[in-house]
């Protein structure tokens, strides 16, 4: 062992799994599920009874949390589904670049410059207008399965 100090910056999730297994029958409305390799929020769950051939089935209707598309899946209720690790983090908005990227201030005082403005028109307008008026804005960033996107905005007053 050397006496040198080893420092590294953790930029990723250190190889942790992006999902965890959960039995289909225990996933509820408002929960999350992975359908077609996309992180989704469950908006409707219906179960069918055990039939002549096999298991009771769960029918999931879910909305992709990043692009808003509706996805559906049918899974036997005893089988495991992938559930994404979904995190929300608040950052203070520092700047908006001309190419559509935002500069955000993290809790430890560093800047995060790798996020684009959201594609949701209403949210995009709120952010641009609020920033143009010189308000202090805090954006909520949702991250799941290696994707990140601004999903909400809070006004914490004038600068």
Curated annotation (Swiss-Prot):
Signal sequence, start to end: none
PROSITE patterns reported in the protein's UniProt record: IF5A_HYPUSINE (PS00302)
Entry comment on modification after translation: Lys-52 undergoes hypusination, a unique post-translational modification that consists in the addition of a butylamino group from spermidine to lysine side chain, leading to the formation of the unusual amino acid hypusine. eIF-5As are the only known proteins to undergo this modification, which is essential for their function.
The keyword Protein biosynthesis belongs to this UniProt entry's keyword annotation: yes
Composition bias type Basic and acidic residues, residue spans: 1-12
GO terms assigned for molecular function: ribosome binding; RNA binding; translation elongation factor activity; translation initiation factor activity
Hypusine, modified sites: 52
InterPro entries: IF5A-like (IPR001884), IF5A-like_N (IPR048670), NA-bd_OB-fold (IPR012340), Rib_uL2_dom2 (IPR014722), Trans_elong_IF5A_hypusine_site (IPR019769), Transl_elong_IF5A_C (IPR020189), Translation_prot_SH3-like_sf (IPR008991)
Chain residue ranges for the region called Disordered: 1-23
Keywords: Hypusine, Initiation factor, Protein biosynthesis
GO BP of this protein: positive regulation of translational elongation; positive regulation of translational termination
One Pfam family, short name: IF5A-like_N
Cited NCBIfam families: eIF_5A (TIGR00037)
Function per UniProt: Translation factor that promotes translation elongation and termination, particularly upon ribosome stalling at specific amino acid sequence contexts. Binds between the exit (E) and peptidyl (P) site of the ribosome and promotes rescue of stalled ribosome: specifically required for efficient translation of polyproline-containing peptides as well as other motifs that stall the ribosome. Acts as a ribosome quality control (RQC) cofactor by joining the RQC complex to facilitate peptidyl transfer during CAT tailing step.
Annotated family: Belongs to the eIF-5A family.
Protein name as annotated: Eukaryotic translation initiation factor 5A
Biological source species: Senecio vernalis (Spring groundsel)
